[in-house]
Amino acid sequence: MASTSNLLDVVRHYQRSIEKHGEDEQRLLHCITKLFNLPIKFEHLQETGIGKTVNALRKISGEVGVAAKTLVTKWKAMVAKEDPSIASTPTAIHNEEDSGKTKSSDEDPDQENKGGNSSSGEDLNTSKHKSKHAKSTKHERSSSSRSHSKSRSDSDKKHKSSRHDKSKDRDKDREGQKEAKEHKEKKSNGEHKSKDSSKSSSSHKSSKSESHKSEHTKSKHEKDKTSHSELKEVKDKSSKHKSSSSKSSKRSHSPPRHEEESQKAKIPKVKSKSEEDSADGFDSSMGANFDDVLGLLNIPISSKKSSSNSKSKFVAKPTAAPSSSALSAPTTAGSSKEALSTSSRPTSKKPELLASTAKLEPLDPNIALELPTISNNYKPMPLNQTVMDVVFNQGGSHKAQASRYFNESEALAQGISSKTMRTKIYSGVRTGQILQVPSLFDLCTRVLQKNIDALEYTGGVPFEVLRPVLERATPQQLLNFEEYNPYLMDDSDVLWQQHVQRHCRSQRREEMETWREMFLRCQEEKDRKLSILAESIKASQKISEAPVRKTQLAFVDSMVKPPRSVQRKQEQYGTKGKLIATPAARVAALSSVTPNAAKVGDARLRVLAAARDTAQVGAGPARSKKAPLMAKTLQFMRGRLKR
């Protein structure tokens, strides 16, 4: 109990914080995150009203609205798990409607075949009327005093006894027929319905207390299945039923009028009791939907179905109410015909699915959780860490998600996410990707960055506007741009500092020197060094060039010696002649005769390298040149012979 009270205090603390800091987005996100992690139950939502407070935050755009929607979805799932009767209420009401139709269809052939069983039909109609009357006064019974219940039970007892005395003899003869009829009702309506019908059929012989107990239990059972919206429709239908019963009671005597007056007296009490219940708060036994707890304006689907069921129930009621005086046979036959006609009316209606507003069963809570909330204005998911944890991690609900199977869409999303989680291999920066719509300033900046060479005089645009463009410029482009716009030199020193640190790291700035002047000085030194280096390279290239080839004459000033073999033969055969004068001596002799003769060193005496002096060199035997392949083969053979 202490932990529950502590949890309620924590929830109320965050509720007050949300109401107090309605404009602080960070505070609201903090409170929603804390509420998401708390183990809040349905009774906590009822006592504190935090559901209505958080539901009001869904209208806020942005991260707060998304987080509030997620928290409301979680609470809806929690309520659906804790109280499944709320989700199953429409189907139970639908089953009641079907069983009511089968019950009326089972009673119709009995009324056709047994025209004389007027008293038994009247008893069944009165028991039905009592049960419907008990449904309309269900809230009044639980809170009314004992004196009021005694007076009402006494009047009911008198009314029952007057009818019981007249139909006593007929009931004895037709007990077997009633048992067969009860057997049919068991087959059509089930065990629960047959118990109620058997109690209503045996109420003539039972005491006043037993009938009161059966009505009280039935009213409790119906109370669990009806909501606050159904009660209003029951009031409207009961007022319509009063008018129809008053018309039919004109034919009979005063007891039905007395019954109508009692109903009129009870309906305001029911209304006051229902207002008290709604003021006290929502009760789980009332069948209130989770949307009612959150204070939404929309009405649950179960109320529509219950209203249609109540309409069919009131249509199936007999219009002729039984009177205390004995009714004649024609009157009973007419009442049975009216009951037949009224019971056959619902069957002639169109099926519910073919109606203009088809009534479908509500979605399964698990499916409703997976569906996104419908919005006319689509907004992308905000990239806030708190919201992402709430939406994707779902707090501490990992175990619940692991137990269930994935559907096709979830399995596909899981496969894609696992593929993106793999190790990525760097393959360069992706260019040309625009992840978001650029602004006009960004578009203009990109165009100027691509066309820096075309920029000239700007007309006095501030430096901060042009800075993204000038940061992409080279030093030469920046110099040209400053020539057209000298006013930028005062602010562009930051850009020149970047160029100096990039190109001239080893240099130091002199005193009272700007970064622009330092860059220009370093550039001049670099150019001078380059020019000196270029000149030295050119000079070395001139020196290293190959000299011009010169052809020199051999044996110009000396005698030409014959080869040794020739010299031996000349000595052997005695053919050794006089030594021939040297070429130089011959030239000198000729120069004395002819002054135009060439002297030593004259260019005319130069002989080409390829030219051969056939007179000086004896004609030896010409050797035939061997082919390269043959020469190689012979060399190989000589090498083998040497081995």
UniProtKB/Swiss-Prot annotation:
Sequence segments annotated as region (Interacting with Elongin BC complex): 439-448
Localisation: Nucleus
Region (Activation domain): 413-571
Any one Pfam family match given in the protein's UniProt record, by short name: Elongin_A
Gene Ontology biological-process annotations: imaginal disc-derived wing vein specification; transcription elongation by RNA polymerase II
Region called Disordered, residue ranges: 86-289, 302-351
Biased composition annotated in UniProt, kind: Basic residues: 127-136, 238-255
Keywords: Developmental protein, Nucleus, Phosphoprotein, Transcription, Transcription regulation
Basic and acidic residues biased stretches: 94-106, 164-198, 207-237
Record comment regarding domains: The elongin BC complex binding domain is also known as BC-box with the consensus [APST]-L-x(3)-C-x(3)-[AILV].
PANTHER family (alphabetical): TRANSCRIPTION ELONGATION FACTOR B POLYPEPTIDE 3
Name of the molecule in the record: Transcription elongation factor B polypeptide 3
Lineage, broadest ranks: Eukaryota, Metazoa, Ecdysozoa, Arthropoda, Hexapoda
